[in-house]
Amino acid sequence: MTGEVGSEVNLEVNDLKLLSQEAADSPVDSGQGSFETLEPLSERDSDEEIFVSKKPKSRKVLQDSDSEAEDRDDAPEKPTYDDSAEDTQENLHSGKSQSRSFPKALADSDESDMEETPSQESPETQEAPSLEPGHQTGHSVDFTTGRKLSKTLLREGAEGKAKSKRRLEKEERTMEKIRRLKKKETRCEESDADRPLNDSGCLLEDSDLFETGLEEENDSALEDEESLESIRAAVKNKVKNRKKKEPTLESEAFSLEDGNELSKGSARKERKAARLSKEALKKLHSETQRLVRESALNLPYHMPESKTIHDFFKRKPRPTCQGSAMALLKSCKYQSGHYKETVNPADAAGMGAEDSSRGSEQRTGAGIAAETNVLSEVSEEAGITAGSDEACGKDPVRRGELEIEETEKHSDDRPYSPGDRSMSQQESSIPRIEDNEGHQAGDLTESDPPALEGEELKTVEKTDAKEGMPEQKTQSAAAAAVAVVTAAAAPPEKVRRFTVDRLRQLGVDVSSQPRLGADEDSFVILDEPKTNRELEALKQRFWRHANPAASPRACQTVNVNIIVKDLGTNGKEELKAEVVPVTLAAEKLEGASHAKPGEKLQMLKAKLQEAMKLRRLEERQKRQALFKLDNEDGFEEEEEEEEMTDESEEDGEEETTEYLLGSEDTETKDEKETDKENTDTSSDIGKSVALCVPKPLSSDSTLLLFKDSSSKMGYFPTEEKSETDEYLAKQSDKLDEDDSSSLLTKESSHNSSFELIGSTIPSYQPCNRQIGRGASFLPTAGFRSPSPGLFRGSLISSASKSSGKLSEPSLPVEDSQDLYTASPEPKTLFLGAGDFQFCLEDDTQSQLLDADGFLNIRNHRHRYQAVKPQLPLASMDENAMDANMDELLDLCTGQFTSQPEEKCQPRKNDKKENMEELLNLCSGKFPTQDASPVAPLGLRSQEKESSTEDPMEEALALCSGSFPTDREEEGEEEEFGDFQLVSKENGFASDEDEHSDSNDEELALDLEDDEEELLKQSEKMKRQMRLKKYLEDEAEVSGSDVGSEDEYDGEEIDEYEEDVIDEVLPSDEELESQIKKIHMKTMLDDDKRRLRLYQERYLADGDLHSDGPGRTRKFRWKHIDDTSQMDLFHRDSDDDQVEEQLDETEAKWRKERIEREQWLREQAQQGKIAADEEDIGDDSQFMMLAKKVTAKALQKNASHTVVVQESKSVLRNPFETIRPGGAHQLKTGSLLNQPKAVLQKLAALSDLNPSAPRNSRNFVFHTLSPTKAEAAKDSSKPQVRRRGLSSMMSPSPKRLKTNGSSPGPKRSIFRYLES
C-alpha cells in the first residue's frame, strides 16, 4: 500500500502541474483572458504576480487550519472504495472540487458555521459521478441539494467513528483547510468568470447596478486566487482521503505513521510540483497571450462594433447563439426567448472557440441552456466533476444514493426546473463526454483550443517522464485539467442558482429585466381616455343601419268606446255606451328615417304648399280689399252686388238684428245661441274643408262677422242657421276645390275661411278671412277681421272693437280713404273687382308679405303717401284682410254704434239709404265722419252700410262689441297685450265668456294659442300706435254701454288721430335737420354752379383745369349739364322753372364765350395775340380778361339778333378751320384746352334735339322736328351775312356763300338748350 500511496503522490504532483497549467490555460482557451478584471489579456501577461500576492494568504490559512473545526468531514472516512488507483484519481478530483467549493461556505459562515461547508461541497460530489470522466457541462447542481448530501456525509462520518478519533480529527482539519482554500480559489475563478459573463447583456448580474447583497458572499472569495498552496492543499487532502479509505478497504492496514510519511512525501513533491507548475503556467500564459495577439478572432468585448442609438435601446445581444445570462436563473421563459437571439456579426467570429467547447457539452445531451461563456461552462463542469469524483470513488451505490437525494432535495426546495433535468441527463450521459472532448480538438472553428491542448499535453508528458508514470499521469492530467477548469465556475453558478431559487420562493419575478423606459402599465393614468370619435360615429351608423327607424304613424281615425252618464226622461241617471271617433294625428318622428330618399323633402314641400295656399288665399282677399278701397268705383259695384245678395239675406238679417239687438238682455241670449250655432256651423265648415277648426267663430270676439251677410257678424238666429250653414259649406267647398278661386262672398264662406285658416294656420299668419270679398260683402262686413287673432294690431281695430274695447274704429274716416290710395300695386294684381281669383299672383304673394305674414301695405303707403300719417297697421291689416267693403265702410264711417239696438234699426232702413251710406262712406263723405274713425272695426257693415245710418249703427254696435260681454273681452285683450286683434281664438274667448256653455274646451285651446301669438303681435304693434292707452280709452268710451256711437265718436277720433300723428310723423327736430340738409345741399350746388360760371368766364382757357397734373377731366355737353343733373332729382313741375332759369344763364355765358372766342380768333389772325401770349405770364391774364371784357361789351352793343345769328353761325359752320396762330393750343391735353375751332365743332356736333328725351346719352344726333328745321333755315340767312363779317377777320376755307340775308325771327340755339 505504501507503494500505491507513493504512486498516488506522484500522480498528484503531476496532476498538480497539469492543474496549474489548466488553471492558467483555461482563460486562454476561452480567449477571454483574466476573469477578474475583464481587461485585455495583454495586461495579465504574468500570473506570477497574482500568485505571489496570494501565497501569503493561503499559507496563513494552512497554518491556522490545525486549530479549526474538525467535526464536519466524516463522510470521506467511509470505507466504501475498492479500487485504490481509481480512488486516487477520484480523490484528487474530489479534493480539488471540495476545496474549491468550500470558499462558498466560508463566505457565509466564515469558518464558524461548518454545516454550510459540507452542504456546499456535497453538491459537487453529487454531480461529480455524472461528470467524472472529465465531461464538461454548463450546469451545476443547486446549492440546496448540498444540504441533503451533507446529511448523508454526516451519517457516513458517524460510521467511521470507529477509527481513532484523533487521527481522523487531524485529517479533517487539514481537509477542511484545504477545502476552504480550494473554495476561495474557485471563488476567485468564479468571480473572474463572472465578469466576461457581463457581456451577455443580463444586467442582473452587474453588481454595480444591482447591489442586492445576494452576491456579497462572493466578495471574500474574490480576494483569494488559485495558488500553489491551494494545489498543495489539494494533494494533502487526497493523500488523507486515501489514508482514510485504505483502512476500510484493507482492514486498516495503514497505521497513523504511514499517513504521516505520506504527508511528508507529498509535501516534498508539492514543492517540486509547484515550481514546475509555476514555470508551466508562465509558459502557457505567454504562449496563450501570443496566440491571442496573433489570432484573427475579434473578441466581442475587445473590438466592439460601432453601434447606433437603436442598439443602445435594444437589449444587449447575447454573446452566444444559445441562451443568455438569464439561463443562470433557470428561467424557461428566458431560455426559450433569448435562445434565438443572434449575436452581432462582429461577435459571431469571437464566438467560435466558445461555441465549439459548448458544442461538446450540448452533444453530451445535457439539454440545458449552456452558459454564455465557454470558460464558465468548462469551469462549472470541472467543478462538478471534481466534486463528484470523491463520491463516485467511494461507492457506486453511494453515488446512486446521492443522485436520488439530490433529486429529492431539488424537488423539495424549489420547483422542478430545467437544471434538475440537466443533472440527471448529465449523470446518464457521462460516458459520452470524453468522446465529445475529442470532437473539440477536431473542430475547425476552434483553432486555439486544440493548440492549447497540445501545449497542455506536452507539459503533461514532461512531468510524466520525470515521475516515471506516463500513463497514470496522462489520465490524471486529463481528469485534473477538467476538474480545475470546471471548478472555477461551478460554485458561482450554484450561488446564483440558489439566490434565484430563493427569490422564486419568495415570489419575486426573476425574469424581469431592468430597463430605462417605463412599462405601459407602470403608470396610473387618471385622465379619462379620449373617445375615438370615428369609432363612435361608425357605431352609430351601424346602429342606425341595424335598427331602421319605425315608420311614422299616419293620421288615422279610431273609434273609442266611452260610457256616458245621461239623465233619462224619468229623471234617472243611466250609463250609456257611446262610440266617439277620435282622429289620431300623424306621428311626427323627427329622428325617423324616411323609407325613400326624397320622402322627407317631399313631405316638407307638401306642407309648405298647403301653408302657401292658405296664405295666398288670405293675401288675395287682402289685395282685393285694398284694391277696392283704392278704386272707389269698385265699392259702388260691390255695393250693387251686395244689395242683390243682401236683398235675399237682409230680411233674415233684420230679423236677426231685431232678435239679437232688440235689447241687451235679449242680445246676450241671442249671442249665446248664435255662438253655439256659429260654432256648429263653423265646425261643419271646417270638416268640409278637411281642416280641423279648433273653435268656430265666437260671435262677439270675432266681431260677429260671421253673423250673416248683414253686418251682424256671426250672430245667426236659429232661423238663419240653415242659410249660414249652406253658405259656409259652399265657401269651404270652394276653398277646397280651388285655393286661387274666389272665395264665396257670403259670411258663411267667411266663417268657413276663418275657421279654415285659423285652425290650420298658426294664428300669427294672416288668414284670408274674406273668402270672396266682392260677393261676401257680408262676410267682410260681418267678418271684417276674419282672423282677428291672426292679425296683430290690424285686426285690433275691427276685432278689438267687436270686443268692445276697440269699439272705436281703428282708423279715422279721413285716413281710411287715404289708407289704401297708397298702394296702387294691388290693382295690377287683381283680375277684376268682382273676380277674386288672383291665381296669377299666387307665387309672388310671399314677396308682398312682411315678416309677420301681412301684406307690405305699410311700405306701399310710405312709398306713395309719405305725406300722410301712417295708420296703425292694425287698421291697415284688418281692412286689407277683411277687404270686405262692409267692414271697410263701417270702419271708414266710424259709425260703430256699440249698441245692437242701433244695428237693428239701420237694417230696418231702406236699402237705398244703405247704398247711399256705403257710397258716401267710400267717397269719404261720412255723415258721421267724426264718429266714423271709431267704426272701422265694423267691417261686416257692408250690408248694413248698404242700409242707412241705422244699419251702419247696427253694424258698428255689433263690431264695437256694444254687447254686455264686451267688458269681458276687453279684459282678455288687455291681458294678451295691448290689443287682441279679434284673433279668432280671442273672439271665441269672448264668446266663451258670454257663452261658456257652448264650447269651453275648444275656446281654452284656442285662447292658449292666441295668447302667445297676440303677445308677439302686440309687441310689434306698440311701435306704430300706443295701443294700450287707446284700448283703455276705448273701453271707457264704448265699454258695454249701449249709448249712441255719436257720444264718443268725436273724442275717439281726435284721440286716435293724435296717436297716429305722434307715431308716424318724425319729430320737429328731425324734420328741421332734414330740411336744413336739403337746403344746404341746394345752396352748395348753386354756389358751385355759379363759381364754375365765373371761372369759365374770367379764367383763361385751360386755367380752369390747370390746377395740377392729376386733375380729372370733366366734359360739359350741352344737355348733360346741370339740367340733366337736375332731372335726376327734380321731377316735379316746380323744378322745371329752376331748369329754365339755369338754361337761360347757361345760354348767356355760352353766348358770351363764343363771342370771346371769335374775337380772340380774329386777334390771333392779326398776329397780335400770338406774339403777346408767348411773353405773357400768369400776371398777363388780367390783360386777356380785359380784352375779353371789352370784346364782350362790344358784342353786347350789337343787336340781339346779330348776336344770336353770330352764335348760330358759329355752331352751324362747325367745319371752319380757324387757326389762331397756334398760340391758343395749350399744352395740357384737356378738351377745353383744344383750339376754339375744335371746341366749336364739338359743340355743333353735340347740338342735340332739345325735344328728344333728356337723358338719352347713347346717341349724339337728333333730327329736328320739321318746324324747328324750318326755323333753323330761316335763321341761317342772317347768320350767313353775319358770318361774312366775322369770317372776314378770320377767313376759313369752308366759308359759306353770302346769300341775301333776310332778317329771320329772333331765335337762338339756346332755345334748344333750355328745352
UniProtKB/Swiss-Prot annotation:
GO terms for biological process: DNA repair; DNA replication checkpoint signaling; mitotic DNA replication checkpoint signaling; mitotic G2 DNA damage checkpoint signaling. One of its GO terms (cellular component) is Golgi apparatus. Residues 65-74, 108-118, 205-228, 632-657, 967-977, 990-1002, 1043-1052 have a biased composition (Acidic residues). The modification Phosphoserine is found at residues 26, 42, 46, 53, 65, 67, 109, 112, 119, 220, 255, 522, 698, 701, 709, 722, 740, 785, 787, 810, 816, 823, 932, 990, 996, 998, 1133, 1265. Residues 22-276, 345-474, 625-691, 713-750, 924-1002, 1032-1052, 1264-1315 are annotated as: Disordered. Residues 966-1063 are annotated as: Acidic patch. It is found in: Nucleus. The modification Phosphothreonine is found at T893. Disruption phenotype: Knockout embryos die by E12.5. Signal peptide: none annotated. Its main location: nucleus. Residues 153-178, 186-197, 391-415, 455-470, 669-679 have a biased composition (Basic and acidic residues). InterPro entries: Claspin. Residues 741-750 have a biased composition (Low complexity). It comes from the Eukaryota. The modification N6-acetyllysine is found at K868. One of its GO terms (molecular function) is anaphase-promoting complex binding. Residues 159-187, 599-626, 1001-1036 form a coiled coil. Keywords: Acetylation, Cell cycle, Coiled coil, DNA damage, DNA repair, DNA-binding, Nucleus, Phosphoprotein, Repeat, Ubl conjugation. Phosphorylated. Undergoes ATR-dependent phosphorylation by CHEK1 during activation of DNA replication or damage checkpoints. Phosphorylation by CSNK1G1/CK1 promotes CHEK1 binding. Phosphorylated by CDC7 during DNA replication, phosphorylation inhibits interaction between the acidic patch and N-terminal segments leading to increased binding to DNA and PCNA. Residues 91-101, 119-128 have a biased composition (Polar residues). CKB motif repeats lie at residues 887-896, 917-926, 954-963. Residues 235-245 have a biased composition (Basic residues). Required for checkpoint mediated cell cycle arrest in response to inhibition of DNA replication or to DNA damage induced by both ionizing and UV irradiation. Adapter protein which binds to BRCA1 and the checkpoint kinase CHEK1 and facilitates the ATR-dependent phosphorylation of both proteins. Also required to maintain normal rates of replication fork progression during unperturbed DNA replication. Binds directly to DNA, with particular affinity for branched or forked molecules and interacts with multiple protein components of the replisome such as the MCM2-7 complex and TIMELESS. Interacts (phosphorylation-dependent) with CHEK1; regulates CLSPN function in checkpoint for DNA damage and replication. Interacts with ATR and RAD9A and these interactions are slightly reduced during checkpoint activation. Interacts with BRCA1 and this interaction increases during checkpoint activation. Interacts with TIMELESS; the interaction is required for leading-strand replication. Associates with the MCM2-7 complex and other replisome factors. Interacts (via the acidic patch) with CDC7; the interaction is required for phosphorylation of MCM proteins and CLASPIN by CDC7. This is Claspin. It comes from Mus musculus.
